[in-house]
C-alpha cells in the first residue's frame, strides 16, 4: 500500500489506484481501496479506534490513477464542495486506436445513464434527462497502432471520457463496453487519472500530483518514455 500513496498529510491522502481496485465498497462485496487504506493507516499509526476516511471523488474500477481521500470531516466537506465547483483540475491519459482525428479538439455531447447496464447513453444534441458533457483532448504521443491523448474534463459525467471518445470512433483500448475490439490482459481499460491540481482545503497551498502509469503494461510504459 505504501507504494500507492503519492501524497499524505494530516488532512488528505492521494492514492495511485490500480486497475481493478474499487474506490469504495459496492454491491459486489469486494474489498475496496477505502477499506484497505483504513486497515493500513490503523496498523501503521497504531490507532486504537476507527480510522476516519472519506472518498472525495470516484474513478471507474477498470481505470487506474489518482484518487483523493479525506482524513477529516472538515477536509471532506471542503473538497466535496471544490469538486462541485470544478476547483479541482483533473487530467487523464487515454490510449485509443490510431485513427485520423484532429490534433486537439473540444467535444460536447449529452449523456444519460442507463441504470440497467451501467452504461452512458450519448446524444449529439440536447435530450430530456441527458446532461451536458464537455471535454478537450490533445494528442501527445503516437505509437505504431495507438495514440495517447491527454484529456481535460470540463464536466464530470458517468463514463464521460469513455462514452465521448467512443462516439467519435476511438474507443479506449480494452473498453469492451464502449466498442473496443478486445479486452486488455489485466481486464482493465487504458484510461489513467494522470494529474490533479488544486488548492489544499486547509493549508491553501497549491497541490500538483502526477501518477505514474501502470508498469505491467508495455503500451503504457511506451507512452511514458
What would you call each of these model-derived segments?
Residues 1-225:
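RNA pseudouridine synthases
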Amino acid at each position: 500500500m505504501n507504494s500507492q500513496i503519492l501524497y499524505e498529510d494530516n488532512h488528505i491522502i492521494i492514492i495511485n489506484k490500480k486497475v481493478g481496485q474499487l474506490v469504495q465498497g459496492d454491491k459486489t462485496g469486494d474489498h475496496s481501496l477505502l477499506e484497505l487504506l483504513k486497515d493500513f493507516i490503523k496498523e501503521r499509526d497504531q490507532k486504537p479506534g476507527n480510522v476516519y476516511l472519506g472518498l472525495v471523488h470516484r474513478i471507474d474500477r477498470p481505470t487506474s490513477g489518482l484518487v483523493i481521500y479525506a482524513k477529516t470531516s472538515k477536509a471532506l466537506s471542503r473538497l466535496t464542495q471544490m469538486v462541485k465547483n470544478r476547483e479541482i483540475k483533473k487530467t487523464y491519459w487515454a490510449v485509443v486506436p490510431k485513427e485520423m482525428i484532429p490534433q486537439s479538439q473540444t467535444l460536447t455531447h449529452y449523456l444519460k445513464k442507463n441504470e440497467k447496464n451501467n452504461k452512458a447513453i450519448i446524444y449529439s444534441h440536447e435530450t430530456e434527462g441527458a446532461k451536458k458533457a464537455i471535454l478537450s483532448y490533445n494528442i501527445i504521443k503516437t505509437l505504431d497502432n495507438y495514440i495517447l491523448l491527454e484529456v481535460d474534463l470540463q464536466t464530470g459525467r458517468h463514463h464521460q471520457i469513455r462514452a465521448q471518445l467512443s462516439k467519435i470512433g476511438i474507443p479506449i483500448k480494452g473498453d469492451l463496453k464502449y466498442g473496443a475490439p478486445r479486452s486488455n490482459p489485466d481486464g482493465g481499460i487504458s484510461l489513467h487519472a494522470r494529474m490533479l491540481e488544486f488548492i489544499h482545503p486547509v493549508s491553501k497551498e497549491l497541490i500538483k500530483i502526477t501518477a505514474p502509469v501502470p508498469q505491467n503494461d508495455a503500451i503504457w510504459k511506451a507512452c511514458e518514455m
